[in-house]
Amino acid sequence: MADTEEGFGLPSTPVDSEAKELQAEAKQDPQLGTTSKAPTSPQAAFTQQGMEGIKVFLHERELWLKFHEVGTEMIITKAGRRMFPSYKVKVTGLNPKTKYILLMDIVPADDHRYKFADNKWSVTGKAEPAMPGRLYVHPDSPATGAHWMRQLVSFQKLKLTNNHLDPFGHIILNSMHKYQPRLHIVKADENNGFGSKNTAFCTHVFPETAFIAVTSYQNHKITQLKIENNPFAKGFRGSDDMELHRMSRMQSKEYPVVPRSTVRQKVSSNHSPFSGETRVLSTSSNLGSQYQCENGVSSTSQDLLPPTNPYPISQEHSQIYHCTKRKDEECSTTEHPYKKPYMETSPAEEDPFYRSSYPQQQGLNTSYRTESAQRQACMYASSAPPTDPVPSLEDISCNTWPSVPSYSSCTVSAMQPMDRLPYQHFSAHFTSGPLMPRLSSVANHTSPQIGDTHSMFQHQTSVSHQPIVRQCGPQTGIQSPPSSLQPAEFLYSHGVPRTLSPHQYHSVHGVGMVPEWSENS
């Protein structure tokens, strides 16, 4: 390796002449790896007083030698790239109480430009003009000699760049040029700085740290060495066969290895919103959906277990279980042997699904209330004879209900004069989610008398031009419409007989379907 005079100078520093004298004596120094200036003149002796006993040792010198034998390459990028191997040294012989400044610079090793061909480096021309030399000052500087000698001095944060306009203080290098790193130990002056003519310093050079700057690795051997030794290059390594073998030997019968996919399936099934008490709790979150069964979950009767209620309830709450179970079974694709037509069911049969009246409960299950809301169209009857076959109760489910036209598409059989009974369009139809809360809010907002169901019923039966009103108490079924009402007063026609037996309905507690109107309104 050729070492030129300008290669080992400290450019743009006031001690440039002393650096040249240091480089001239370094060629005569038989010891490789360390360079120290001997006093040759009174001025030089004064400058270097107290710096003679300093020794520097390169850390991981064997690794550096491996790279040096092949031809060390260092990547340079526009943003800056760190060196590997990192430049780390061990310093001895410093005055423990004196403050020192440690810094590095990287200078051209020769005036040649290189190329890599035929698995070797060769000179291809004259070197480009060197960039202005930059000094990298160690972040701990200035510090006492005791601090520097206590541990390794690492310059791993130093970065190399090929951006000539780099504003971050990185070392600027040219690609395909050879460079030599140098370490400088400078005794700090009274201002904790350096640069004056009387500044004492020493420079240490390790030839095995020389490298060629490249934008991408040229020698595949260097690439392999960096992958094998750089802990940050583990992403380029393959799977470690020895590690897999060691893990396979650690497996035993007592602790079998379970695939992660199986664990995820078990966890998702345990926390499914359709199993156990989690399913009951999740029904409240489905209030915003149109129907709870539209999520497309199909299950068999063996998979549907009774929901576990964390609160103790009385026996009269059994309809919560039945309605929830029935709704899950309606979502099933299997045929049930106990299906019964809706119109053929008699009130004498003890079927919990068709009981005419239930004790009024404040905390009804969400699925029960939603199912009741889905059947509200059955309660709007008219005197027109049914032309189509009446569907069964099991057919009126979440899967077939969208075929029923909404209120917005229903035709009006007859219209009362505007002064007697103005047409009130029913704003909340069945496709807008749960019906019960919206009807209550509309009724309470329109007429304050709707809140009391008993007084409402008594008042509306005395008015001859009121729509049909359904009312039920805790111990009574659904009331039939008054006989004084005419068929023309029914606003909606669905082809269902007017007089239906009470057992064909679910009871809805305290809900006025149409706001109250009077002659004076």
Curated annotation (Swiss-Prot):
Highest taxon, organism lineage: Eukaryota
Organism lineage string: Eukaryota, Metazoa, Chordata, Craniata, Vertebrata
Entry's free-text remark on domains: The T-Box domain binds to double-stranded DNA.
Subunit: Monomer. Homodimer (via the T-box); binds DNA as homodimer.
A biological-process GO annotation: negative regulation of cell migration
Pfam families given in the database record: T-box
Compartments (UniProt record): Nucleus; Cytoplasm
Skewed-composition ranges (Polar residues): 31-45, 262-281
Stored PROSITE patterns: TBOX_1, TBOX_2, TBOX_3
DNA-binding positions: 63-238
Comp. bias (Basic and acidic residues): 17-28
Protein name as catalogued: T-box transcription factor TBX5
Gene Ontology MF terms in the entry: DNA binding; DNA-binding transcription factor activity; DNA-binding transcription factor activity, RNA polymerase II-specific; LIM domain binding; protein-folding chaperone binding; RNA polymerase II cis-regulatory region sequence-specific DNA binding; scaffold protein binding; sequence-specific DNA binding
Record key words, sorted: Cytoplasm, DNA-binding, Nucleus, Transcription, Transcription regulation
Primary subcellular site in the record, as a coarse category: nucleus
Organism name: Gallus gallus
Gene of this entry: TBX5
Spans annotated as Disordered: 1-45, 254-281, 332-352
